UniProtKB/Swiss-Prot annotation:
Entry-linked Pfam families: SfsA, SfsA_N
Disulfide feature: none
InterPro entries: SfsA, SfsA_C, SfsA_N
Organism encoding this protein: Serratia proteamaculans (strain 568)
HAMAP family: SfsA
Molecular function, one GO term: DNA binding
UniProt similarity note: Belongs to the SfsA family.
Name this protein carries in UniProt: Sugar fermentation stimulation protein homolog
Gene that encodes the chain: sfsA
Amino acid sequence: MIFSPPLHHATLIKRYKRFLADVITPEGETFTLHCANTGAMTGCATPGDTVWYSTSDNPKRKYAHSWELTHTQQGDWICVNTLRANTLVREAIEQNLVNELSGYSKISSEVKYGSESSRIDLLLQAEDRANCYIEVKSVTLLQQQRGYFPDAVTLRGQKHLRELLSVVESGQRAVLFFAVLHSGIEQVAPAHHIDERYATLLAQVQQLGVEVVCYGAKLSPDGIYLCDKLPFFID
């Protein structure tokens, strides 16, 4: 995924009200960015970090600029725009970069499914195999050299796990895909210490057939690309 038009950078002053952040440019201009991330963003929004942002030409937008990347003072790159994860995973599948998800002839996004009024992020289909339902999650929380999900209690995430299990029970394939969008993360685990119910439920549905796939990414102001498969651990 290439950023076009190119991103620009500024220094983070503060993030607030979840969806907003104030920054200051190298020229001394201050303004407010939109932040498309509902999570806690722990370690991703420290005042003084470098923020890379995109700019929309839509005149109806209240905030023209969107926070895309953080370059931390420790040197890590993080994609904080969670809307990018689905695009990254779809591109990687279409380019046959994810071995676990190859061999399908059709890919669709945001398809309604399940008994709890959900929409699956990606649906893979082929004539010679069962449908594959993929729920994509962005991982950015780094603690003690390990990436954790979620970074806040997520009832919606728990619902998605139940829906994925129902897919498996219907004889189809269900995949929970962790897109690791933090350059410092080398392995992933469920965050028992943040959302114990989610972590317990994830362990249960994995044992019952929901697949878990984790891939890291190369991140820069030029673009983001999924690359290496990363290990997933249930402690």
